[in-house]
From Swiss-Prot:
It catalyses: glycyl-tRNA(Ala) + H2O = tRNA(Ala) + glycine + H(+); a D-aminoacyl-tRNA + H2O = a tRNA + a D-alpha-amino acid + H(+). This is D-aminoacyl-tRNA deacylase. A Gly-cisPro motif from one monomer fits into the active site of the other monomer to allow specific chiral rejection of L-amino acids. It is found in: Cytoplasm.
Amino acid sequence: MLTVLQRVKEARVDIDGQTVGKINHGLLILCGFEPNDSLENIKRMLDKCINYRIFEDPSGKMNLSLKDVNGGLLLVPQFTLMADTQKGLRPSFSNAASPELGRELFDNLLTLAQKCHQNTQSGCFGANMQVYLCNDGPVTFLLQF
C-alpha cells in the first residue's frame, strides 16, 4: 500500500459536479493498493496517519497529530499511485490490486476510519473525481506499508 499524506487547510472531492466529501483543516490521504495488502496493512496505515505528528504546536514545531488538532480526514482511492513508470512512455498498472480487491480494501479503510475518527470523508472508488485542496505548508509525505 502506498499513501500520499497531505496536510491541508481545506479539501474536497467532486463527482459529476457534486461534492461527495469535504473537510476543513486536516489530512487528505491518497491511497493506492497492491495485491498483497491486507486488513493489517490498513490498520497500521490508518493508525500511523491519524497519530502522525505533522501539525504545528504553538511554538511552530510539528508536534501535533490529526487527533490533537481535531482535524478532518479525507480519504481518496488512487490506483495510479501503484504505476510502474520505469519502462517506456506509458505507465503499467500490473502492481496495483485488482479493481475488486482495491474496492474491498478501500471500503475496509473507510469503515475503520469512520469508527476511529469522527470527521472522516471520502471520495468514491472507481469514480472520475476532481480533488481540490489547499495544501498547508506544503506538508506532504509518501508512506509505504
